[in-house]
Amino acid sequence: MAKKKAFSPIFHLSFIVFLPWGIYLSFKKCLGSWITNWWNTSESEIFLNIIQEKSILENFIELEEFLFVEEIFKNNSETHPQEFHTGIHKEAIQFIKIQNESYIHMILRLSTNLICVVIISGFYIWRNETLVILNSWSREFLYNLSDTVKVFSILLLTDLCIGFHSPHGWELMIGSIYKDFGFVQNDRIISGLVSTFPVILDTIFKYWIFRYLNRVSPSLVVIYHSMND
């Protein structure tokens, strides 16, 4: 009976970890060909080209300038307009293919992640028993820890999330989320999130210590302040 009781939380925890991964891979494989075919219709091209028009024009102008300079260095003389335009045409086709693949992957990642979030959220709402079992197991596990271990875990977690070196970690994590959802990386937005999100977390954590830990375990608060100082 005890073995079965110990196995149940591990099973549910493994289920929560591997279910999103399995759903993501399955939908990514299934939706790939469908999104590629949808992209090749004129409606999708018009819609996305309007959104990305500025980016495409800037990249194409840079490509044209690069090819012009490269042609000058190759010939060391006056360039031939016909050859130059032919080269631009070939490179432009290659550039459009790369952009096309980039947009397909962007839509695929975004749609797959959104579908996964909806399915997993619905599943956990429907199977509330799984979350109840994990909640009771985690409460029992934390209750059996000593106050010193609890404080050490809190300090380690807070230093990782809102410590001196945490901005670099937040930058990598937010950048990976941007990439995973298929968004174009924006350094200004990422910098703003990195500079504000840890501050918000720090405020929430201090409020939690003040309201919850003082009420539940005053000795834990004393040990926390002693170790933190």
From Swiss-Prot:
What biological-process terms (Gene Ontology) are attached? proton transmembrane transport
Q: State which residue ranges cross the membrane.
A: 7-27, 106-126, 189-209
What is the species listed in this Swiss-Prot or TrEMBL entry? Cuscuta reflexa
Q: Which UniProt keywords apply?
A: Hydrogen ion transport, Ion transport, Membrane, Plastid, Transmembrane, Transmembrane helix, Transport
The way it spans or sits in the membrane comes to: Multi-pass membrane protein
User: What's the protein called, per UniProt?
Assistant: Potassium/proton antiporter CemA
Report the locations given in the UniProt record: Plastid membrane
Catalytic function, reaction form: K(+)(in) + H(+)(out) = K(+)(out) + H(+)(in)
Q: Gene Ontology cellular component? A: plastid membrane
Function recorded in the entry: May be involved in proton extrusion.
- Tell me its family: Belongs to the CemA family.
Q: Which HAMAP family match?
A: CemA_PxcA
Broad class of where this protein is predominantly found: plastid
What InterPro entries does this protein map onto?
CemA (IPR004282)
Question: According to the lineage, what is the superkingdom?
Answer: Eukaryota
